[in-house]
């Protein structure tokens, strides 16, 4: 196993390292790990990961994938396998980082299929029991011999269920991330206790319309494939589809989930007789997904701020989310936040061009905007019922010095629908990182 150091992944910083967990609680019946197999050029960074169901019974799986037209080969292969098996009997995930295997033609498809074939073989899985994912530079073929040689080594020598195994797995899927993103949680449904573990990668090319990055949820709860798919889609819409770093949607973005039932209890499905257990699990996974997705924003390439856009009292959830997304993806707003400039006109501009459902979705005379500090101190009104406030620039500057900030928009429609969206600022460092990404 490999200790996480500043050299384990690109740009690991003292600031970011505070988000790396020192311990965790992990679901029963899984083995995970990560190694360096040679995809990344530095000769040492972890670049190959496996998550395996070891419970002995077929797991349920679900997935949500990018809508980018240039879907990478692993996205196409994984979608096909998931559909063919109706989500039942997917028992492992295999992931490489450092190369996206995207826009790589027929060879890319063969390489993705071979990664599945070799993984299933070394893990003694039935055929097509693994989903495959890749992340990294677009347009280059995989060094497939290195990957296919690394899979047996990883499977036989480096899989386990300790905290370090999970950290290795989370580290091995990183590209421009500054820290591995790993979250765990234990919760109860009735008399049954279950555990969730989630890991993801993402720091750039983050934009809604799922998927937005690579992410993996695994649990020891017993869940049917159809219920897991429905819950995952609902959770992703309120988490990973509610974040933005730079407005780019990747060719490879994938969120997958696996439930092996190792903790026992009544099987959770999406029928009326199981509504209470289903609702409880959905609530847990939504909150869990939001926590994990927010780590991606905190690790936004070059980011210095974590910004929550909170839209309240919209006519519909769709309107609330669309307006929040419009603000979060505004480069003018994001650069103003980096410059600690309370230029609230940029917020109103983004509200005004948001894609909303009706002419009554945004009424300027009813719209209010304010900065809300997360430290509990007084908020700062910028606009109240369409009327601009005399902004205390000194107070605004004080609020904008903080790393975390809430921008709250109240539409005053009496529709009562709310949405949160998470974003970061846009800095000089973002250009620096992406200007030499392939070097």
Swiss-Prot record:
Site for Involved in the stabilization of negative charge on the oxyanion by the formation of the oxyanion hole, residues: 135-136
UniProt catalytic activity: N(2)-acetyl-L-ornithine + L-glutamate = N-acetyl-L-glutamate + L-ornithine; L-glutamate + acetyl-CoA = N-acetyl-L-glutamate + CoA + H(+)
Residues that bind substrate: 175, 201, 212, 301, 434, 439
Keyword Amino-acid biosynthesis annotated: yes
EC id: 2.3.1.35, 2.3.1.1
Positions annotated as active site in the UniProt record: 212
Modified how: The alpha and beta chains are autoproteolytically processed from a single precursor protein within the mitochondrion.
EC supergroup of this enzyme: transferase
Keyword entries, A-Z: Acyltransferase, Amino-acid biosynthesis, Arginine biosynthesis, Autocatalytic cleavage, Mitochondrion, Multifunctional enzyme, Transferase
Keyword Transport annotated: no
GO cellular component terms listed in the entry, alphabetical order: mitochondrial matrix
GO biological process: L-arginine biosynthetic process; ornithine biosynthetic process
Subunit structure: Heterodimer of an alpha and a beta chain.
Family: Belongs to the ArgJ family.
HAMAP family with a match to the protein in the record: ArgJ
Other facts: This protein may be expected to contain an N-terminal transit peptide but none has been predicted.
Protein name: Arginine biosynthesis bifunctional protein ArgJ, mitochondrial
Species, as recorded: Candida dubliniensis (strain CD36 / ATCC MYA-646 / CBS 7987 / NCPF 3949 / NRRL Y-17841)
């Amino acid at each position: 196993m490999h200790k996480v150091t500043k050299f384990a992944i690109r740009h690991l910083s003292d600031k970011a390292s505070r988000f790396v967990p020192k311990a965790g609680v992990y679901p029963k019946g899984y083995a995970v790990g990560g190694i360096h197999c040679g995809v990344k050029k530095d000769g040492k960074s972890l670049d190959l990961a496996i998550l395996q169901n070891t419970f002995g019974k077929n797991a349920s799986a679900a997935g949500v994938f990018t809508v980018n037209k240039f879907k990478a080969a692993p996205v196409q292969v994984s979608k096909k396998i998931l559909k063919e098996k109706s989500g039942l009997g997917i028992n492992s995930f295999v992931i490489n980082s450092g190369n996206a295997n995207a826009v790589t033609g027929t060879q890319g498809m063969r390489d993705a299929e071979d990664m599945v074939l070799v993984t299933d073989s070394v893990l003694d899985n039935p055929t097509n029991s693994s989903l495959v994912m890749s992340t990294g530079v677009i347009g280059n073929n995989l060094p497939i011999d290195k990957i296919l040689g690394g899979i047996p080594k990883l499977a036989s020598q480096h899989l386990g269920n300790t905290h370090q195994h999970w950290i290795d797995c989370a580290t091995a899927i990183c590209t421009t991330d500054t820290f591995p993103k790993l979250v765990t949680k234990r919760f109860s449904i009735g008399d049954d206790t279950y555990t969730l573990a989630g890991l993801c990668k993402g720091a750039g090319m983050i934009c809604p319309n799922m998927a937005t990055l690579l992410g993996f949820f695994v649990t020891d709860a017993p869940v049917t494939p159809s219920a897991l798919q429905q819950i995952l889609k609902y959770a992703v819409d309120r988490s990973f589809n509610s974040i933005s770093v730079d407005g780019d949607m990747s060719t490879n973005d994938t969120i997958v989930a696996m439930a092996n039932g190792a903790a026992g209890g009544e099987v959770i499905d999406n029928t009326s007789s199981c509504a209470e257990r289903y609702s409880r699990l959905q609530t847990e996974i939504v909150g869990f997904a939001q926590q994990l997705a927010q780590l991606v924003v905190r690790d936004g390439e070059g980011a210095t701020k974590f910004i929550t856009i909170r839209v309240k009292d919209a006519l519909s959830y769709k309107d609330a989310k669309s307006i929040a997304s419009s603000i979060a993806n505004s480069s003018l707003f994001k650069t103003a936040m980096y410059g600690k400039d309370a230029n609230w006109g940029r917020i109103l501009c983004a509200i005004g061009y948001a894609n909303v459902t009706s002419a009554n979705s945004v009424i300027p005379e009813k719209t209010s905007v304010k900065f809300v500090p997360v430290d509990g101190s007084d908020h700062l009104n910028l606009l109240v019922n369409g009327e601009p406030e005399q902004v205390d620039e000194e107070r605004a500057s004080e609020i904008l010095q903080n790393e975390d900030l809430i921008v709250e928009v109240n539409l005053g429609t009496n529709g009562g629908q709310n949405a949160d969206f998470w974003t970061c600022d846009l800095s000089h460092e973002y250009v620096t990182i992406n200007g030499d990404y392939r070097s």
